[in-house]
Regions:
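Hydrophobic alpha-helical segments embedded in the membrane of multi-pass proteins
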Residues: 134-141, 174-179, 195-211
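Juxtamembrane helix-loop-helix connectors linking adjacent transmembrane helices
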Residues: 45, 49, 84-150, 160-161, ...
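Membrane-interface helix/loop boundary segments of multi-pass membrane proteins
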Residues: 150-176, 210-213
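Alpha-helical transmembrane segments of multi-pass membrane proteins
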Residues: 32-43
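Hydrophobic alpha-helical transmembrane segments
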Residues: 23, 27, 59, 97-101, ...
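Membrane-helix interface linkers and caps
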Residues: 2-15, 43-100, 123, 216
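Membrane-interface helix caps and helix-loop-helix hairpins in membrane proteins
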Residues: 185-193
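Conserved small/polar residues in nucleotide/adenosyl-binding loops
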Residues: 243-244
Length: 245
């Protein structure tokens, strides 16, 4: 298998690669994400915004994920000392239209399958398919997109590349990178089903990264799943509804 231009090996392929650089990137991302989230929370509190409930709570939650974008960019550029483009795509990359097509197809497939399960399996009505959609949906969709991008940058662009660099094996790297992905999603802690669900999510997104040599299609599918999970009100069991942002 050629490593030249391979997204999985983007960290190890750097001329200045050293074993400690991926570790330093990971630590920097974690510390910076916590720091940025704290700053965001304090700023909102100083502005008199109550982030414990309502829309403020929702968007603060999105913001605490979105700050990972800045954390990754800073860590990769100034700690890892590598091009920030290396956390987005290998070479050759994905054609620009492919992620948009992937989002549309994934959203249709997910919506149809889960709606059929909800309506015919659990007695929901068709109106409940978008029962949670609100007036702020366009804004929330942007937040969902940025959150999906943030997670793919962090877990596929940093963690996956780090574990692959250390093990020199993409499969082992993918399996190891799934662990922190599960750990940051407390929704998974309630049952073994939740853990399996998030583990499968991580492997699916990693497979998309492998096939398309970059994170953009994974971001699109990630966004599609989270979008449906946000707007639906089908009353499905938690094991069916877990989503990843």
């Amino acid at each position: 298998m050629s490593r030249t231009g391979n997204f999985f090996f983007a960290s190890r392929n750097q001329p200045n690669y050293a074993w400690w650089r991926p570790l330093a990137e990971i630590l920097a991302v974690v510390v910076l994400a916590v720091l940025f989230t704290g700053v965001l929370g304090l700023t909102l509190e100083a502005a008199g915004v109550d982030t414990s409930s309502g829309a403020a709570d929702k968007y603060f939650g999105y913001g605490s994920v979105i700050v990972e974008i800045l954390a990754v960019l800073v860590a990769v550029r100034f700690i890892g000392r590598r091009p920030v483009s290396s956390v987005f795509t290998g070479q050759p990359g994905t054609k620009p239209w492919v992620p948009f097509a992937a989002f549309a197809v994934a959203l249709v497939v997910i919506s149809v399958v889960m709606s059929l399960v909800g309506v015919y399996g659990y007695g929901a009505s068709w109106g409940q398919v978008v029962g949670n959609i609100g007036a702020d949906f366009p804004v929330e969709l942007v937040a969902l997109a940025l959150a999906a991008l943030a997670e793919e940058m962090a877990f596929r662009g940093v963690f996956l590349q780090a574990f692959t660099a250390w093990t020199r094996n993409p499969v082992i790297g993918a399996l190891l990178a799934a662990v922190p992905f599960i750990l940051v999603h407390p929704q998974a802690y309630g049952s073994p089903v939740g853990i399996v669900h998030y583990f499968a999510d991580a492997l699916l997104f990693t497979l998309l990264v492998w096939v398309f040599n970059g994170i953009w299609v994974a971001v699109a599918v990630h966004l599609a799943w989270n979008t449906f999970g946000t707007v639906q009100d089908l009353g499905l069991p938690v094991s069916c509804l877990l989503y990843t942002s």
